[in-house]
């Protein structure tokens, strides 16, 4: 085709037919070749697209398969969860059924227990009614028994008990030893004497009266003393009575006004520290009060912290020793008088000589009879001696000298001390207080202070009716009254003053 213009140019514008034919033929051939190549290109494009579609389809299939597999897995998991939930639900249903059954059983048990409680209450009511019936039936028997016991107890009146004790004392007076003439008798065997007297009181009690483990030994002494006083009352009615005011007691020395009674037996000069043969009056100021010592042997004696000996009795009786008060008179203390009395008045004097002689004779007869069984006189343990020689008492006899409606004995004393002495030393001091001055009991006071039953520092101070002409002075007296001081090795007796209690000390050395 490149040569055709040259031919045209060369031929000066004339067209060569051969060249035109050749050009057309070349054009058709080129056209056919281009269309064939396009078809082949389209076929190739279609194949690629088909391949892509196939790949996409394969991917979709794979993803669907994976999805299905995942779905199956999820479904299986959900199925297991559902199965678990169903099993849990079934278990809960079973538990609810069991709880319902247990609730029903508990309800039945509660009903049974309520029935049992009701039956038990009914039985209790029945038993109460039976007991009330039995008690109502037994009350007449108890009343009859109590009446019989009261009759039996009423048979043991104070007079009868006095007679029993006096019979025992008269029977035992023939079996006593002669320790009254010896100088070391008395307190050396004081515990045996107390035991024998307690046994005498127990043996003299009535069979219908129950006995106690610790009987009151002051009781028998009191009853026997009452009978002795009944015998001596005709001789003592004309003797003057002493009304003495109480004086408070303290552990420390107190300034007490000393009044020395004028007695013919008091002008004896002491030639030794403790002369046994001197006939002088000794009385004791006892800080211990005895309350309600009854006529039976059922008294429980105890010493409280304030120095009082309280006795609580089991049975009622008509003979009591009343308490020692602060507002009543003090009988039997020769060295202490009321402020209204004179120091040398006749009412301030000691016991009559006839009373002392009778008392000493009775004690010597009881102690001389039997040396193997040492006993103490029933009057040795009396607390206080009145000026007539005995305790100020109202007996239960038919005499008209009764000053108290319930036949009680009024022992009056002032009690302000808080010390509580032992019982052994207390009873021994009581025996010394009621015994005469020439008794061998006084000679053994030193033995009392060293005895195992004696508590050192106890209350054991004598009031000595000494002569006013003595020249010894104590710091505890206001008016510088004469006195003498005795000391023992364990502190038994603190002070023996002329007519007064000078001081109460613990352990003098």
UniProtKB/Swiss-Prot annotation:
Residue segments, region Disordered: 1-42, 134-185, 223-275, 290-414, 465-509
Compositionally biased spans, kind Low complexity: 10-39, 226-248, 255-269, 292-350, 361-414, 465-483, 490-509
Subcellular location(s) per record: Nucleus
Region (Leucine-zipper): 78-99
GO cellular component: nucleus
Superkingdom: Eukaryota
PROSITE patterns: BZIP, BZIP_BASIC
Keyword Nuclease carried by entry: no
Residue span, bZIP domain: 50-113
GO MF term (any one): DNA binding
Keyword terms, alphabetized: DNA-binding, Nucleus, Transcription, Transcription regulation
Disulfide-bonded cysteines: none
Cited InterPro entries: bZIP (IPR004827), bZIP_sf (IPR046347)
Function of the molecule: Probable transcriptional regulator.
Similarity-based family: Belongs to the bZIP family.
Name the UniProt record assigns to this protein: Probable basic-leucine zipper transcription factor H
Organism: Dictyostelium discoideum
Gene: bzpH
